[in-house]
Every structure is written in structure tokens, then in C-alpha cells.
């Protein structure tokens, strides 16, 4: 049993069907939706601010999802919300565990889980696409190191600040006085407080995430036989930008050591390779990311 006890959520529901019942219209669905509600920060500011903005109760979401998956239904939407709750509560550790759980869920229950196949393949697909969007947004504001201000979103802000300063007649110093120091130099100073080992550890944690996503997608395409593509494209792109950003603050020799080699799916060559049957390894191999790098926001600004 792992730390988050996700293995117990994969045991069959006691009753006539291992997948339990359809709970789409069960009150627990609405209860989880309500617990996930989180008003944006701007709603607590300004003249028309909401006095008590809603804040998501992720512990409640996690508990409700666990009880439901264990005792009532093997539901894909509930599973996606569960992954989201672990991520929100435990950051990268929770995300790793959640993605591992989702891969096993799809492997074991895809043929019988809810929503049923009769509702159409696009219904299930949409649940995964929405999770992709939610995870991508979370990662953009996820602290890359212990400092909560060191995020991909803050890096974007620093690049925008530099661009604005280059166009401002008043110059960077005046901009800092009026808006605060959001410069690239200030961002680099914040990262500079951490040693190479810490940055390298974080780099590797983020670099491991695509492998977890590969497993989910390989199980999905193994069952659906759809044309292979990246379901979690947004999450992958955000992870790529994060690892590229972290690598900027590592010496070249450490970057070379941390470089992620291309996926190998030969039997026994990887942990994942040992767990997938031969036919499914072909699906896993097809998910190997291209070596062509997409244009980042920084490159676009430079041009």
C-alpha cells in the first residue's frame, strides 16, 4: 500500500458490478463540484469585490473522491478530480501519485468504468482533456523551489516586465519604483539562493512527469484504438517550459548529466517496459516526444 493508499481505490466495488453504479446524478457529484469552486483572486479586490470569495476545499474533494471510488463507483470524472486534489494538496508528490493511479485506473477499468461507452467516446475523452487544462494551469503557478514566488508564471511576468521596460520612456528604474522589481535580474537572484543540488533535484522531479503521462496515454490508446496523439498536450508543454527554465540555472555539466534520454520500450529496458505487454509497448513507443522544441514565450519576445 502506497502513502496515499490509492491501491485500495482500485479494488472492485462490492456488489453486482466491479465498477459499481452510475453516480452522475448522485448528490456527491454536486458536493464535489461545490468543494472545487475557487474564485479568482481579483474577485477579492476593487470596488466590486466579493466579501467572501469561495476557496476550494481540496481535503474535502480528496475524501469524497476516495469514498466514492472505493465504495460506490469507478467513475472517470471522480478519478480526474481525485488526481487534481492530490496535486493541489501535495504538489509534485501528489501529482506523481495521482498520475500513477490514473494509469492503473484506465488499465483496469476502462472497459467497464463510468461514464459508460454508450454515452459516446467523446464524453470520457473530455474528462481527460479538462484534467490536462487544470494540471497545466496548476503547474504554471506551482513553486519550482521552496520560494513560492519562483514559478513559471513569475518568469513570464519578468519577461513581460523587461519587454515593457525596453519600450518605456521612463526606463527600468522608474518602472521598478511604480510597479515593484519584477525584472529578470530579480528573478535570477531569487533562484540564486538555492544550490545546484536543489535545483537539479527539482529538475529531475519535473522531468519524470512525462513518463507518467506516457503510461496514461498508452493505456488509453491501447483500449480505444484511436489515432495516437498527446491528450495531455498542455501539461506536457508547461512541463517542458519548466524544465527549460530550471536548466538555465544549472552548470552545463549538470545539464548534460540530467539530460533525459529518448524513451526506450524494449522489454526490460525501463520500469514501464517491464510492466507493459508487447502490443502495448508499441503504443508507448509512439508517444515518444519529438525532439523539435516549440517556440517559448521568451523566444517570441526576443524576436
Regions found by a protein language model. Give the residues of each.
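Polyanionic, low-complexity intrinsically disordered segments
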Residues: 1-55, 74, 93-96, 100-303
Amino acid at each position: 500500500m502506497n502513502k496515499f493508499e490509492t491501491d485500495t481505490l482500485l479494488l472492485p466495488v462490492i456488489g453486482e458490478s466491479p465498477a459499481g453504479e452510475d453516480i452522475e446524478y448522485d448528490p456527491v457529484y454536486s458536493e464535489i463540484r461545490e468543494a472545487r469552486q475557487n474564485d479568482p483572486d481579483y474577485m477579492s479586490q476593487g470596488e466590486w469585490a466579493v466579501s467572501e470569495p469561495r476557496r476550494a476545499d481540496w481535503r474535502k474533494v480528496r475524501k469524497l473522491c476516495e469514498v466514492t471510488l472505493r465504495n460506490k463507483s469507478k467513475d472517470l470524472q471522480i478519478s480526474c478530480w481525485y488526481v487534481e486534489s492530490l496535486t493541489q494538496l501535495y504538489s509534485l508528490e501528489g501529482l506523481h501519485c495521482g498520475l500513477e493511479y490514473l494509469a492503473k485506473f484506465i488499465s483496469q477499468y476502462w472497459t467497464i468504468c463510468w461514464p459508460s461507452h454508450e454515452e459516446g467516446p467523446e464524453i470520457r475523452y473530455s474528462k481527460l482533456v479538462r484534467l490536462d487544462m487544470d494540471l497545466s494551469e496548476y503547474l504554471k503557478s506551482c513553486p519550482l523551489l521552496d520560494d513560492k514566488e519562483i514559478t513559471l508564471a513569475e518568469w513570464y511576468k519578468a519577461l513581460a516586465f523587461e519587454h515593457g521596460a525596453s519600450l518605456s520612456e521612463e526606463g527600468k528604474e522608474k518602472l521598478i519604483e511604480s510597479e515593484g522589481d519584477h525584472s529578470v535580474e530579480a528573478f535570477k537572484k531569487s533562484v540564486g539562493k538555492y544550490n545546484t543540488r536543489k535545483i537539479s533535484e527539482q529538475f529531475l522531479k519535473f522531468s519524470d512527469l512525462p513518463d507518467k503521462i506516457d503510461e496514461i496515454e498508452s493505456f488509453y490508446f491501447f483500449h480505444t484504438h484511436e489515432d495516437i496523439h498527446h491528450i495531455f498536450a498542455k501539461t506536457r508543454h508547461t512541463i517542458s517550459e519548466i524544465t527549460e527554465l530550471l536548466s538555465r540555472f544549472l552548470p552545463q555539466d549538470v545539464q548534460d548529466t540530467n539530460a533525459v534520454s529518448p524513451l526506450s520500450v524494449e522489454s526490460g529496458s525501463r520500469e514501464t517496459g517491464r510492466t507493459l505487454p508487447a502490443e502495448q509497448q508499441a503504443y508507448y513507443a509512439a508517444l515518444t516526444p519529438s525532439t523539435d522544441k516549440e517556440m517559448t514565450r521568451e523566444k517570441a519576445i526576443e524576436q
